[in-house]
A protein has these predicted regions:
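Catalytic cores of RNA-modifying enzymes
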Residues: 1-174
């Protein structure tokens, strides 16, 4: 990646951590990403730089978010779980290139968010990244495509079976 950001190391990690005993919400399909190699691959593969707006779907406890903030011009994290909102806001409070939106990705107006943020921050490209809940991966991807939002790439983690279905030839039974 080679991009050293002005934001590196500005984290309030003490009170911005997921509390001990935090239970993932099965109803939300939560599976937090914490493998640094995978995180690095996502950031590198997304070709993010300081002219990039990143929209992160489902930031969870912010492991990927940390690297996105370091690489991007601006990061908007969209998180549904109200238990994680104060954790994310605390963890990244020292960053002027981050905001979290407490909303369901399937209900948010992604085109307006992208258009307004690109204009407000003078950014030239948009990347969408995320670790998607398995049971709503297809609806999320469909919504993003149908939204007409301007984004150059979509880099997501998904369950292998979902990826196989998306990549399958029409009419193939999986």
């Amino acid at each position: 990646m080679g991009n050293k950001s002005k934001h590196k190391g500005k984290y309030n990690t003490g009170s911005g951590r997921v509390p001990h005993g935090f239970k993932h919400a099965k109803s939300l399909g939560q599976n937090f990403l914490n493998d640094q190699n995978v995180i690095d691959d996502i950031v590198e593969g997304s070709e993010i730089d300081e002219q990039t707006l990143v929209v992160e779907i489902g930031p969870g406890e912010g492991a990927l978010t940390t690297e996105l903030i370091d690489a991007a011009g601006y990061v908007i994290a969209i998180e549904l779980d109200d238990r994680l909102i104060p954790i994310l806001r605390t963890k990244f409070a020292l960053h002027d290139n981050f905001e979290v939106i407490h909303e369901d990705i399937l209900k948010v107006d992604i085109k307006s968010i992208v258009d307004e943020s690109m204009s407000a921050h003078g950014l030239t490209k948009t990347r969408i990244v995320g670790n998607l809940p398995y049971y709503i991966t297809t609806p999320i991807i469909t919504k993003l495509i149908e939204s007409k939002a301007r984004f150059e790439s979509l880099t997501v983690m998904m369950q292998k079976e979902v990826g196989d279905r998306i990549a399958a030839e029409p009419g193939t039974k999986l």
